[in-house]
Amino acid sequence: MKKIISIFLLVSVVFAAKDTLSFVAVGDIMMGLNYPEDAPALPPQDGKLTFADVQDVLRNADITMGNLEGVLLDSGGSAKQCSNPSVCYVFRMPERYVNHLVDAGFDLMSVANNHSGDFGEAGRKGSVKALTEAGLGFAGFEGTAETYSLEKDGVRYGFAAFAPNTGTVRFHDTEKSKRLISELRKKSDIVIVSMHIGAEGTGSSRVTRKTENFVGENRGNPYEFARIAIDAGADMVFGHGPHVPRAIDLYKGKFIAYSLGNFATNASVNISGISGYAPIVKIKTDSKGNFLEGEIISAIQKGEKGERRPFLDPTGACIEKIKQLTEADIPETELFIDKSGKITLKK
């Protein structure tokens, strides 16, 4: 009888623990370049140190996600051509680098962005192959990997990712976006949405609540789409694309990060000033995805081209910046950020 009671109590504790769920989200990840072949930018020790200083944080959540900014492909593919070469970048990473993501603790990757098609169909297939073989969840490719579902510790998670780019699930198709999220809602306990949206660069850290354009492209309205996603059934929305941090927000009890900036961009991405800020956002929700509390963990990228990686930042620069942006752009938000990075509901 004592043994039966002990087992019952153990099971009860396990299920009680899932009343609170934790999520970690970070920004753009590009771990090193194997293109062009005559001038690669690969990190020391073949990238094994990429997440060394932050992996304890990344591993400490029920679900950890990021944005894979580029393709996983060892060779080949046709590099994209741009009408304006001065703002044209192509990112191709060795397929084996997917193991660094697994080792760091990632569960989900968005492939909905403007670099997931840098090497055409060959690049997309390479990414799908590498991520699938590594057991990493991913979403955002039109027609082939539009959404992703997984069950972990008895909780069913649904993941969808959107961008404005060809080959991705495009947020411009509002009805399709809503349908995909709604379908996930029906079969998931928690629905997570990634949006690659908004203008880019150091001058694009503000949430304008308007449609944003960059190099002639309609990059969408982050404020509006986050609400569309939540109304359709999302429990949290994480933004990528601007390459700088933006404000955070709460809508109908669901958490929004409008942009998480750059996280681990080894080469070819500007990391000066706020472009080098690499915030790690950790939130806790109840079993229905309603926000309970959170934390901004400050990190910053350091190193020369080919050696860059994120380091924890004791100065709290990310915290201060996101707090400032949130107070300026979303003054009505229900969220309060204290100086240590703790995110709570306003009293």
PLM regions: where:
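Acidic, metal/ion-coordinating pockets
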Residues: 17-347
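Short, intrinsically disordered low-complexity segments
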Residues: 1-2, 17
